[in-house]
Amino acid sequence: MIYKVLYQKDKIVNPRRETTQTLYMEADNIVQARALVEQNTPYNIELIQELTGNSLKYEQEHADFKLTAFGQTNSED
C-alpha cells in the first residue's frame, strides 16, 4: 500500500501548517509506515493517510510525487 505522510522536519520546533512537508512511501500497513519513518528520521509525524483509487491517481499526477524508500533489513534467523 502507498501512504502519504505529513510531517515537520524535527520534533523540537512547534508545528506550523506553513512548514508541513510530505513524503510518499510503501508499507504493508499504517503501523509499519509510522515505524519506518520514526526509525529512520527525526520527523514529527502529523498525519499518515493511505492512498487508494482516485486519491492515489491524483497524487501521482503531481510533479512532487516520489516514493521514499528507507533501508529495510529483513533478518530472519
From Swiss-Prot:
Matching Pfam families: RpoY
GO biological process: one example: DNA-templated transcription
Reactions catalysed: RNA(n) + a ribonucleoside 5'-triphosphate = RNA(n+1) + diphosphate
Gene Ontology MF terms: DNA binding; DNA-directed RNA polymerase activity
Keyword Nucleotide-binding attributed: no
GO terms under cellular component: DNA-directed RNA polymerase complex
Top EC group: transferase
Annotated family: Belongs to the RNA polymerase subunit epsilon family.
Function: A non-essential component of RNA polymerase (RNAP).
UniProt name for this protein: DNA-directed RNA polymerase subunit epsilon
